Curated annotation (Swiss-Prot):
GO terms for cellular component: cytosol. Keywords: ATP-binding, Cell shape, Cell wall biogenesis/degradation, Cytoplasm, Ligase, Magnesium, Manganese, Metal-binding, Nucleotide-binding, Peptidoglycan synthesis. It comes from Shewanella sp. (strain W3-18-1). Residues 124-330 form the ATP-grasp domain. The gene is ddl. Pathway: Cell wall biogenesis; peptidoglycan biosynthesis. One of its GO terms (molecular function) is D-alanine-D-alanine ligase activity. This is D-alanine--D-alanine ligase. ATP binds at residues 154-209. The lineage of its organism: Bacteria, Pseudomonadati, Pseudomonadota, Gammaproteobacteria, Alteromonadales. Mg(2+) 2 binds at residues 297, 299. Belongs to the D-alanine--D-alanine ligase family. It catalyses: 2 D-alanine + ATP = D-alanyl-D-alanine + ADP + phosphate + H(+).
Length: 337
């Protein structure tokens, strides 16, 4: 049996570029445990330039091959691609649209599902349409006096708010605001990251995460894990990835009843099916002191860094990451044939 030429595409040039490289390390080491794959790792920078790990400039052509700038190097045909790119253009659906155009099979959610989940406004509309509870919010489409007034009214009504760029990940462009005098500047900062902004009511709650993925034709939802931050903090970009972070994670959340755990998992599977996700996702929830469950967000290409929850929860559920990748890829390529 010939080996599968697998393109591991990483980076992307967004604010999450370096995190994507860390996740790619995990994918690369996992794929190396199987003799089924011949892996070429290529980094995409913010200028749209492709480079191999060896530094060779190249491009992914519509003939489904990597063509090198050094013409003495033979083109490398691509059978399959893993777009290990957090944020733009990986989780936004953009690069998946290109793969669809050139008919290149790829790992992860398809373009429309990726786009719907990445945009916080679209996602919340989907959550509500599916009957899944989520945090109260308003959305703003431009930075002006009216937007500032709406955000200040929301703060007055809710006591504390989050102002979030609608299309960013890893808490980029996300700010907790308790002081009305800071609303205008924070709103301006958020609009610097995206053309739309979401203002959400601050929810004092536990932050629970569920890994939801396809395994041998079944949609699997793990037991909820938990992100635990210092009191009065939230899981910022720095809290996620800085060495000084005091946040910790429990692969299985403690003191969550079986009934609540099963309801969270049911909501997660409902979201996965309803939004037509594919292969993998991490679905995040709030659990309040009153045991109210609120869907927070869906990550269509969850991080796979040393501190990331998705691979830990998958492994805790009894599945091996390399075997999982092999099953998904082989099933997909077999269906294509």
């Amino acid at each position: 049996m010939s080996r599968i030429n697998l393109l591991l595409l990483c980076g992307g040039g967004s604010a999450e570029h370096d995190i994507s490289l860390m996740s790619a390390n995990y994918f690369e080491s996992s794929l190396a445990k199987s003799d089924q794959f011949s892996v070429l790792r290529v980094e995409l920078d913010k200028l749209g330039q492709y480079r191999t790990a060896a530094g060779d400039e190249c491009e992914l052509t519509n003939n489904r091959e990597i063509r090198f700038r050094d013409e003495t190097k033979a083109p490398w045909p691509v059978d399959y691609v893993i777009p290990c790119i957090h944020g733009y253009p990986g989780e936004t659906g953009d690069i998946q649209s290109y793969f669809n155009l050139i008919q290149l099979p790829y790992f992860g959610c398809e373009s429309e599902a990726s786009s719907n989940c990445f945009n916080k406004i679209t996602a919340k509309m989907w959550f509500s349409a599916l009957g899944i509870p989520n945090t109260p919010y308003i959305f703003l489409h431009q930075y002006d006096d009216e937007a500032i007034s709406q955000a200040q009214t929301a703060l007055a009504n809710w006591g504390s708010i989050f102002i979030k760029a609608a299309s960013q990940g890893s808490s980029v462009g996300c700010y907790k605001v308790d002081d009305s005098s800071k609303v205008a500047q924070v709103l301006k900062d958020a609009f610097g990251y995206a053309p739309y902004v979401v203002v959400e009511k601050t929810i004092k709650a536990r932050e629970l995460e569920v890994a939801v993925y396809e395994y041998n034709g079944e949609i699997v939802a793990t037991l909820p894990g938990e992100i635990i931050c210092d009191t009065n903090t939230f899981y910022t970009f720095d809290e996620k990835y800085a060495k000084s972070s005091k946040a910790r994670t429990d692969v299985v959340a403690k003191d969550v009843s079986v009934e609540l755990s099963e309801q969270i998992r049911a909501y997660a599977i409902k979201a996965f099916k309803g939004m037509k996700l594919r292969h993998l996702s991490r679905i995040d929830f709030f659990l309040t002191a009153e045991n109210e469950i609120l869907l927070n967000e869906i990550n269509t290409f969850p991080g796979s860094t040393p501190i990331s929850m998705f691979p830990k929860m998958l492994q805790n559920h009894g599945h091996d990451f390399t075997e999982y990748l092999s099953l998904v890829i082989n099933n997909q390529l077999s269906a294509k044939d």
